[in-house]
Amino acid sequence: VLLALSMPTPALAPLGWVALGPLCVAVARTARRPAPRGPRPFLLGLVTGLVMFAGTVSWTSDVLAIFGGLNAALAWLLAGLLIGYLAVYPALFSLALTAALVRGGTPALVLAPDIWVGTEWLRGTLFTGFPWVLLGYSQSDTLAPLQAASVVGIYGLSGLVALPSAAIALLVTPDRGRQRARVVLAAACLAVVGVAVVWGSARVRSGALLAGPTSRVALVQGNVPQGQKWDPAHRDAILERYTHLTAEAARRGVDLVVWPESSTPFVWNRDAEYAEIMRARLVSAGVPVVFGSDEVVGPSEFYNAAFVMDAQGEIRGSYRKMHLVPFGEYIPVRWLLFFADSLVEGFSDFSAGQRLTLLPVGSHRLSVAVCY
């Protein structure tokens, strides 16, 4: 529950620092039991994972129902299967931590952050990866600790956030003869967190994040209901909404406007009429725009792409999404999961981009992150 609550929405970020504590304590107590321990360590992690992911990714059932055209029962079944699969990784964490505790005693709890990061990396890599709901994301709105990500990345940030949970487990789990070691290790965990937060706070206050030339950027969110997005009856209204908001932002003197992923209600390079209408309106606004749109190349390549258009209406660069969403944008191991074609028909034919691309905007170069 703490893991789910710490994530963006409801974003109770402080809970992230202690969210693994209850699981670590439960696993430590289980590891102290005489063998055989049975399936208890695995089940502890599995239940933790089920609650965690049910609270964070159950909304995918709506995506399957709206875009996949599935009935509610089947959509919930598939979302449940996804949640069950993701829950296996906290279960693996519990098994690995139990093994470490059996060999090294309670002080081995100091390894909990490393083991957790290992299972996150595994989850983000296997079967093309599912890198959502990483523990480090709980601090996405907390600037001081977030600075550590510039040095150690998201997985390192997850490990940092897990350290206080390890410290709590070290302090509350009894182990005769090893009290001094437990206290020293817990203090070391908290000291690492303290150093990272102090350094991050100093970095934020120093203005290092604002060093160099700056630009004013407007983010345009059309808030288009998903049921209307690809409905031809709403195409004109959607385009009007985005271009109107862009013109409004331009009047406020911004240097760049950014639209969301797949924001155009048409395929950019296949619908010349709407592309020209959009181009003319953006030229009138007089500001560069980064926008998301589908792109078709040849008879079989279909990309989720981002484009940058300069103030004169010329496309100056594009980026094709490289890490696609399984079952949303493509079907992994299609030869084995051929039966899934009908579940995601029309939404799984995207091709993966092959290279990283920086988009030029004036003297700046932009890196575009597309969902997932």
Q: Language model features by range: what are they?
A:
Residues 202-372:
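Soluble catalytic domains of enzymes that build or remodel membrane lipids, polysaccharides, and related
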Residues 1-204, 240:
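Membrane-embedded alpha-helical bundles of multi-pass enzymes
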